[in-house]
Amino acid sequence: MSAEVALVYRVLPESVEVDIEKLKNAVVNKLAPKYKVDKVEVEDVGFGIKALRFFIRMPESDEYSSDEVEELLRSVEGVGSYELEYFSRLSF
């Protein structure tokens, strides 16, 4: 069995006006065809701003990359910024 890679991205919306649930769904839908989103957490940042934390799993393969995940995040309307918080190889 091949190993997998776990990624955790923290995503901030462009502004406080962005609907956080719509943004969450848009990101999940953009990633879902290829990447497995295990969990999404909503975090209060302050001043009415909420951040989203995406827990993503992907096979360890040349066909998958964090660069591609970041390209997909950039392409979602409403995403202001993102940060890779965690990257680890999983093997069972």
Swiss-Prot record:
UniProt cross-references to HAMAP family, sorted A to Z: EF1_beta
Cysteine disulfide partners in this protein: none
The keyword Nuclease is assigned to this record: no
PANTHER family named in the record: ELONGATION FACTOR 1-BETA (PTHR39647:SF1)
Signal sequence range: none
CDD domains: EF1B
Organism of provenance: Pyrobaculum islandicum (strain DSM 4184 / JCM 9189 / GEO3)
Lineage: Archaea, Thermoproteota, Thermoprotei, Thermoproteales, Thermoproteaceae
Family: Belongs to the EF-1-beta/EF-1-delta family.
NCBIfam families reported for this sequence: PRK00435.1
SUPFAM superfamilies: eEF-1beta-like
Function: Promotes the exchange of GDP for GTP in EF-1-alpha/GDP, thus allowing the regeneration of EF-1-alpha/GTP that could then be used to form the ternary complex EF-1-alpha/GTP/AAtRNA.
Keyword Protein biosynthesis: yes
InterPro entries: eEF-1beta-like_sf, EF1B_bsu/dsu_GNE, Transl_elong_EF1B/ribsomal_bS6, Transl_elong_EF1B_B_arc
Name by which UniProt lists this protein: Elongation factor 1-beta
Listed Pfam families: EF1_GNE (PF00736)
Tree of life domain: Archaea
Gene this chain is encoded by: ef1b
